Amino acid sequence: LFTGWEKRDGYLRADAEDSLRLKRLAAEAAEMIGDFEKPIYVDYDADLCAHSRNSLNGCSRCLDVCPAGAITAAGDTVAIDPAICGGCGYCGAVCPSGAAQTVVPAADMFGQQIATMLDHYLEAGGKTPRLLLADETHGAQVIEMMARFGSGLPADMLPMTMHSVGRVGHDLLVTAVAQGYEQVVVIINPAKTDETTHINAQIALARALMKGVGADDEARFLLIDEADPDKVAEQLRGARPKKSPKPAPFSPIGSPRGITRLAIRGLAGSQNVGDAAIPLPDGAPYGRVEIDTDNCTICLSCVSACPAGALQDNPDAPQLLFREDACLQCGICVSTCLLYTSDAADESSS
């Protein structure tokens, strides 16, 4: 009857064939007193959404990853049902424009929290800090079990719990490295690996960005999908980056997209890497538009269709202008072009 019923807040759940469990839940519900307020997990700005323009499909990243069916198409934008949304954070991790931003955690608040935690660690004499991201259920329980029955976390591992690690995107990963963490480890529930494939794509994008600023290392970002605390502990004490870039601390204020650019620009400066295009994986939300200038008639159809303002006209001359930092790679301009003189290419400028 419900999509993603197990992810919805405010419900008591039991197997329909378990009559004893159903009776216990009924008794438990009867004893509940007070009000329940459904949390709002996502702050959505339809003005920034690049889902569609003029009936031409563009970005559908959030629709593709939402496991609860809380997001539906609504014309040129999408609609997010707060009653269904369970706060997995997937939409916030993949949204290229910042139209869908998670409230817990907000990208800028996350950056400030890990920076503050890092400052305290370094002031206490800590060395080679590593960041461990875990959710409040599976991840927190694994860490607790490691502390209770094992040797606990490594001394240089700084843990931070999140409502859901599904929000971990390339923006959070590169921000952590820029602030000074030499490694970022994410613990996910192995029972949900089919839902968290987007995290692998986000890590691949973060690795490509790191390679572009001369800080690539396979062990820089580590994803652990284990339920056994001993196996988690073994991986935490395993591979480490061979070399870390010089930190480039900054104030993470603004949209996830803007924060990512600040982090990469800072790392490029600390690594003495000149301005150059960074090759990115297919589907990356950064890149350029290639235009066949010999056949383009400057009809400006693409300008009026571009949802991000990346394509602009010159009011004083027949000229088509492009802002690479604004391009979302949604592909609407390519679909709009009457003569098919434009194409999209995945890359980013540091």
Residue spans for each PLM region:
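Non-ligating segments of multi-cofactor redox enzymes
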Residues: 1-42, 46-47, 55-57, 127-314, ...
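Short beta-strand "wing" residues that participate in macromolecule-binding interfaces
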Residues: 73, 102, 313-314
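Conserved small/polar residues in nucleotide/adenosyl-binding loops
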Residues: 340-347
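Short low-complexity, flexible loop/linker segments enriched in glycine and/or proline
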Residues: 116-118, 199-202, 327
